[in-house]
From Swiss-Prot:
InterPro entries noted in UniProt: ADOMET_SYNTHASE_CS, S-AdoMet_synt_C, S-AdoMet_synt_central, S-AdoMet_synt_N, S-AdoMet_synthetase, S-AdoMet_synthetase_sfam
Chain sites annotated for binding L-methionine: 58, 101, 249, 280
Organism lineage string: Eukaryota, Discoba, Euglenozoa, Kinetoplastea, Metakinetoplastina
Gene symbol of the encoding locus: METK
UniProt protein name: S-adenosylmethionine synthase
Entry binding sites for K(+): 45
Superkingdom of this protein's organism: Eukaryota
Amino acid sequence: MSVHSILFSSEHVTEGHPDKLCDQVSDAVLDACLAGDPFSKVACESCAKTGMVMVFGEITTKAVLDYQKIVRNTIKDIGFDSADKGLDYESCNVLVAIEQQSPDICQGLGNFDSEDLGAGDQGMMFGYATDETETLMPLTYELARGLAKKYSELRRSGSLEWARPDAKTQVTVEYDYDTREGKQVLTPKRVAVVLISAQHDEHVTNDKISVDLMEKVIKAVIPANMLDAETKYWLNPSGRFVRGGPHGDAGLTGRKIIVDTYGGWGAHGGGAFSGKDPSKVDRSAAYAARWIAKSIVAGGLARRCLVQLAYAIGVAEPLSMHVETYGTGKYDDAKLLEIVKQNFKLRPYDIIQELNLRRPIYYDTSRFGHFGRKDELGTGGFTWEVPKKMVE
């Protein structure tokens, strides 16, 4: 066993990516439901293509919703205000196909305000944390997200006058991977590759795009000591990217689950988040798993941590729990699992109560990731990012 170098990559997308647009529409609908009825049962999907956005799914709520207004305001907020950008919030078609939740599912879950509330579906959910950044998120992810956020910020402010809403970023980091003494310790060394594909107007030159992305985005986000003469840059490598948003590619809720989580690190159970109320453990238990993993790393109990939870539909208690610290734990993983069980209640009701999830806090999560963030909009969200002091 030794120390050797590895390369690992993570990607991110801006709010104008067609799949992300759909995530935001679904969570905007969810927030509207929860604002009017905290006990709403929501499973809202969205899809988008040229000149069209459709919301569909199952919703049971006392809230009165204006779907047309919610969808159009979301599209406007993203920045799609003309057809040549990929979508026009004023003229696009908004289609709605919403039904009530299946009575079979509803009766199987029990009272939404009961401690015995059953999980909304089966599945396994993962949470991950690492000490390589202040947010306890992977560096590859934080850098890719940082590039996407900076691009969006400059686009919105007009500092990138040619920029349009749809963009993707990707960062490859070289790590020292130390496997001595049975551990798996990762130490970031340098940024090996930076990739940005940014939608632009038809007048700007490729050279102008490259200079702006390098000077205003990359150098503003990635520390200079992480870049070197060997770092490779791919800036709009396809050449031109005028047609973007839903005009360029169809969008669908739930297709950016790695962007939503840890950039490929840890693991993923497959369930998406957006458009789902907190009785759906795809969302609430994934938030709880991150809360546990972050609490372990923040508390100095491990340098890296992966947590898995598993549930059955209609059953309140998790079927299984697993903690993996990659040999970096203060205690062995079995001991850490016992500490977790002593400090966290993980029935859906308990997760919802502890993290205060029956509130309209989800729209902000639907762009730029669900983890490693603070409450930037003042909605009281991201409670799962506040580590819990655990009794050992």
